[in-house]
Amino acid sequence: MKQRQFFGTDGIRGKVGAGKMTPELALKLGWAAGRVLSRTGTKKVIIGKDTRISGYLFESALEAGLSAAGLNVLLVGPMPTPAVAYLTRTFRAEAGIVISASHNPYYDNGIKFFSTDGSKLDDAIELEIEAELEKPLTCVESHLLGKAKRIDDAAGRYIEYCKGNFPADQTLEGLKIVVDCAHGATYHIAPSVFSELGAEVIAIGDKPNGTNINHEVGATSMGKICETVLAEGADLGIALDGDGDRIMMVNRKGEVIDGDQILYILAADAQKRGQLKGGVVGTLMSNLGLDLALQALDIPFLRSNVGDRYVMEMLKKNDWRIGGENSGHILDLDHGTTGDGIVAGILVLAAMRRQNATLEQLVEPMKMLPQVLINVRFEGSNNPLDSDLVKSAQREVEQSLGARGRVLLRKSGTEPLIRVMVEGDDHDLVLAHANRIAAAVKLGC
């Protein structure tokens, strides 16, 4: 299959006003997507966004391009990525578009698509859109132009959907929960979901101003929520990222519960209820402790490439339901078609209620192995992983670790980063090895 030029592993993403993320490209992308999507279906597309200041200009540009191609546009405003997937399904739209750069800083933005069933757009359709981008932009005749309107009750619809994933015979009464919305797309949704289920909610990261998304809050910056859980004497904390498709949690001791541990909780709970279909899909970055804990329960475990797209592919291939990443993308195909931080949190809380257990008790059987991840930024077109210096450092570290650990080096699919991950049974040794390889990567840039 032909390689995609514009779409990456999670749509198009970059710094606003540079490279691909320009108003001109967004206009042309809307038109190109409209040309492809108008060939079949309802000729109706949903557009949602996170809280970045640049979301307004990309929303307008996409809307204009889609309308020029003859598609009607439903605007839902700031809305979590999984909410757009859900609304795309329920409105029977031809596609959903999300304007977001997820966990990236505010000066980045991105555009990604969902198909009519709420899943990521197929590679083949993305290639068709890219082919249309090479053509000159034209406009349909005036009477065929698309219309645009705003959906005022989109947030309420999604709140009810989220609550519907919690057992009807249970409540969250008696629980004090800190909810960190990362100043992102869940700011007007997540606190309502958990409070309406009965919890006492302390919201942080719920005051977006266009430039503070993910800044020292959210699932990629856990210091604030850990402090707040301890200061408030809360039972737990739930941290979401800027577009709401990731979750990290915090127990009452202020300790972080990551995506691997959440996967263990969900898989173990599903097995207890006889509802686990097959096994669990993690990624190359998943902690070895998850693998070992699932082995103890006789639950099969497979690793995909990094990225929720690849986790989804492996789940579908094996007809399994639960998978995800240690970064907090959690997929449960019985409860949605994409990673959903709010729903994943609800499923963990449901497990706590069913088993009358705390978050610490649910995760206690899983012992995390020391794992160090270092992100090394690079510039230029050369791949530092091709450097002989890096290859030599990796080889020597792997020989030192032997069967007691592993090394993973990978180039990020969304940022100019090399991710250096080292795992083993001795934290100090793992840290030293990771720093050694990271230094080699910097020299190899």
From Swiss-Prot:
UniProt enzyme class: isomerase
InterPro entries: A-D-PHexomutase_a/b/a-I, A-D-PHexomutase_a/b/a-I/II/III, A-D-PHexomutase_a/b/a-II, A-D-PHexomutase_a/b/a-III, A-D-PHexomutase_C, A-D-PHexomutase_C_sf, A-D-PHexomutase_CS, Alpha-D-phosphohexomutase_SF
Keyword tags: Isomerase, Magnesium, Metal-binding, Phosphoprotein
Required cofactor(s): Mg(2+)
Annotated Gene3D superfamilies: Alpha-D-Glucose-1,6-Bisphosphate, subunit A, domain 3, Alpha-D-phosphohexomutase, C-terminal domain
Keyword Cell wall biogenesis/degradation recorded: no
UniProt EC number: 5.4.2.10
Cofactor comment: Binds 1 Mg(2+) ion per subunit.
Single Gene Ontology BP annotation: UDP-N-acetylglucosamine biosynthetic process
Family: Belongs to the phosphohexose mutase family.
Known catalytic reactions: alpha-D-glucosamine 1-phosphate = D-glucosamine 6-phosphate
Phylogenetic placement of the source organism: Bacteria, Pseudomonadati, Pseudomonadota, Gammaproteobacteria, Alteromonadales
This protein's record includes keyword Iron-sulfur: no
PANTHER family for the chain: PHOSPHOGLUCOMUTASE (ALPHA-D-GLUCOSE-1,6-BISPHOSPHATE-DEPENDENT), PHOSPHOHEXOSE MUTASE
Role according to the record: Catalyzes the conversion of glucosamine-6-phosphate to glucosamine-1-phosphate.
Catalytic residue list: 102 (phosphoserine intermediate)
Protein known as: Phosphoglucosamine mutase
